[in-house]
Amino acid sequence: MINSLLTRLFGSRNERQLRQLNSIVAKINALETELQKLSDTALQAKTTEFKQSIQDGKSLDKLLPEAFAVCREASRRVLGMRHYDVQLIGGMVLHLGKIAEMRTGEGKTLVATLPVYLNALAGNGVHVVTVNDYLARRDAAHMGRLYNWLGLSVGVVYPGMPHSDKHAAYGADITYGTNNEFGFDYLRDNMALSKADRYQRGLHYAIVDEVDSILIDEARTPLIISGPADESPDLYIRVNRIIPHLTRQENEEAEGDYWVDEKGKQVHLSEVGMERAEELLHQAGILGEEDDSLYAAQNLSVVHHLNAALRAHALYQRDVDYIVRDGEVVIVDEFTGRTLAGRRWSDGLHQAIEAKEGVPVQRENQTLASITFQNLFRIYKKLSGMTGTADTEAYEFQSIYGLEVMVIPTNRPTVRKDYPDQVFLNRSSKFNAVLEDIKDCAQRGQPVLVGTTSIEISEMLSEHLRKAKVKHEVLNAKQHEREATIVANAGLPGAVTIATNMAGRGTDIVLGGSLDTVLAELDPDATEEDRFRVKTAWNRRHEAVKAAGGLHIIGTERHESRRIDNQLRGRAGRQGDPGSSRFYLSLEDSLMRIFASEWVQKVMRLMGMKEGDVIEDRRVTRQIERAQRKVEAHNFDIRKNLLDYDDVNNEQRKVVYAQRDELLDAESIKENIDSIRHEVIDALVTRFVPEHSIDEQWDLPGLQATLQSEWGLHLPLIEMLKGREEVDAERIAFLVQDAVDKHCAEREASIGAETMRALEKHVMLTVLDQGWKEHLATMDYLRQGIHLRGYAQKQPKQEYKREAFELFSEMLEHVKREVIASLARVRIRSEEEMAALEEQERRQVDTLLRQSQFQHQEAGGYGTGDEAVSLQRQLAGQGAAIAQVIRDTPKVGRNDPCPCGSGKKYKHCHGLVT
């Protein structure tokens, strides 16, 4: 109550901050008249003047009013667009390193030019991050005209571009690209073998467009560079043939071989199913001996393949989670509906789906480098973002990224009507209502955008509309090449557009169609009269659509996140235009079935509803939103959990990458190598000649043999020590050190000091990279089973940190030993051989990177993970008796009437006891 009173008196934090920024807007506006009087040359010269001021010590904050005013005036002259006051506020929010929530159609792309221009003046490079390559190239080309006019260079990075072009793009003042490309290049730079091979020049300032999509939706997707492993894919094909012979259970307690946990996205074999699977695996010749258990230690890889195959068949649907195109399985992003070409699910899931679909199964991949988007974007010294929907995730932005969300007011009031949800008993009734609504809009000349959650539904609706002879367009992952054209025409009178979540984010749907697109299609020789005629026709269409009610949004299903629903609604009602939205739901929808169906079903039963009847009640909508909040909270917990674990990896990643940077920047690492060599020799001698030990405990033959086998050094220690008195471990260490130092000095003299320095750097980099790659694989294995420590009353995260530290320390010690051993073994006779070796290694890395892939690594869901179930099954396989509960009465729901006849709900009666 006190908080609400204070808010009424002083305004919310958002309102107070907006008032402060409005005072700076007044300063910017005061400069406009003077700047309008300047010639183009004088206005362009302001950029040089600003750069000099920065070199003289002036801060960007002090420059902000004048720099924003210059950018606005330049935009008016070059692009024909002048920033509104609210857009100036949005620009300031971005410069301050915050997230600006701006509604669809408020000109986010134009807003970004203000902080981009100001921060690019510092000369450190600004990265503008977009959700796809099309938007990166479009914005770089369109806004590049403004930046180039102001004397700043612009580059764009995209997959597969030539090395020289990418170097130039990162060398520009402003670089556009996708989150994937910036992340991939960051990892690739940290695999480079020389400074010249690196692209990026540090991560200083980034503006992330559609920040919620990148920092929230994709936060559970680590970016992974992987190369093919050695294992044959044949086992996936053989295991896949077994799955159709297993029976799915309706629920955990029904008969069958496996049951599906849709909330947790897991599939579990029953006891009967485990026996049946073992029998089938024996018949297929995959398991050997008759008494060979599926969960015996030697068969763990078979368990891995079986789990992957079960998930592929039970959880992943074609044209929903993936499509098959040109003989390949291509992932469909669950949040955007776009295809993710080149990306693969990890843990053998992708191979299992390939086997299921009968396409060539590619080899599993080994992780070479990885980073989550969470940790990638936290590397930037300053980060900001824009989106139309961030406020629902404000807590996550603040707690994970330290980013505050500010809601920017619209330039004109929003007049869109959001109608209550309509809820039906089944999908067929729902889709009948959707089709009727679409036909009604088309007849009245009102454009309609239909949002679907999958390609399958979009194509099903398309088929029904085709039969009804309703002209329409489909925008999904299969037609993404025509995205810009479809979106440009989606606002035409009576246009019907069916879209998956992708829905053309980044491109406004203009009522009456896109005027710019129509003008661009005119003949280059078109007269002003032709252009006027086109504009007049567009104005008529624009007014006709407004009179029909503007763009109407139909949602065919609620998404797990309210934010995705709001994004769909936000397509209508841009810049004060009319518009409307309505969601059609059924009890068979995923969200309703899993999270919200029980309460709504009871309401429907009480109302005596039958097929075709509909509920339209705000209380139902609120109940659904409550379910969405639960899912959002659960997904936040998963992302936070992922970050907690990845933070451990991140600290290690920072150490390794910092070490690589030092190696690449150093002219010579001779002192480091000498220090490492002495440390390694001391450890080696201690291993065979322990300190404070007696002669009988020494293993001089073992030490001598190790020096010979690992380092190629013949040192007759036993003969050297014969007849000497008072020989101890310290004396032996001195003799070995001296012999090794002389051996290294002789090698350096034979090949030359310069070649030796190059060899030392090359070996150190190569061994460090190999050690890090193997360490990543070890960490993956550790992480997969670490939660089982909970059974031993231990805290899994603390155990993970402890073991990760031990593994990392072991890896560093191994790298030291291997570096010294490699330097002793490698035979280089000339500078030319060294150059050839470096070139060969560089070609291998280039080839590896060309073959590398992005991978999705799915985070776990509700309930117990696969590994915990596997442990339980292992115990069963080893003869541990697990009692099976047999239910002799029907299961009673918590909110059902108690069977005792009291009339109370079960949870308030006998349910209290259980």
Curated annotation (Swiss-Prot):
CC annotations in GO: cell envelope Sec protein transport complex; cytosol; plasma membrane
Entry EC number(s): 7.4.2.8
Binding site for Zn(2+): C898, C900, C909, H910
Any one Gene Ontology BP term: intracellular protein transmembrane transport
Cofactor stoichiometry and binding remark: May bind 1 zinc ion per subunit.
InterPro entries in the record: Helicase_ATP-bd, Helicase_C-like, P-loop_NTPase, SEC_C_motif, SecA, SecA_CS, SecA_DEAD, SecA_motor_DEAD
Bilayer topology: Peripheral membrane protein
Subcellular location: Cell inner membrane; Cytoplasm
Pfam families for this protein: P-loop_SecA (PF21090), SEC-C (PF02810), SecA_DEAD (PF07517), SecA_PP_bind (PF01043), SecA_SW (PF07516)
Keywords attached to this entry: ATP-binding, Cell inner membrane, Cell membrane, Cytoplasm, Membrane, Metal-binding, Nucleotide-binding, Protein transport, Translocase, Translocation, Transport, Zinc
Cofactor (UniProt): Zn(2+)
Catalytic activity as recorded in UniProt: ATP + H2O + cellular proteinSide 1 = ADP + phosphate + cellular proteinSide 2
Residues engaged in binding ATP: Q87, G105, E106, G107, K108, T109, D508
Cysteines joined through disulfide linkages: none
The protein's assembly and partners: Monomer and homodimer. Part of the essential Sec protein translocation apparatus which comprises SecA, SecYEG and auxiliary proteins SecDF-YajC and YidC.
PANTHER family: CHLOROPLAST PROTEIN-TRANSPORTING ATPASE (PTHR30612:SF0), SECA INNER MEMBRANE COMPONENT OF SEC PROTEIN SECRETION SYSTEM (PTHR30612)
Similarity section: Belongs to the SecA family.
Stored NCBIfam families: PRK12904.1 (NF009538), secA (TIGR00963)
HAMAP family membership: SecA
Job description of the protein: Part of the Sec protein translocase complex. Interacts with the SecYEG preprotein conducting channel. Has a central role in coupling the hydrolysis of ATP to the transfer of proteins into and across the cell membrane, serving both as a receptor for the preprotein-SecB complex and as an ATP-driven molecular motor driving the stepwise translocation of polypeptide chains across the membrane.
Protein name in the entry: Protein translocase subunit SecA
This protein's encoding gene: secA
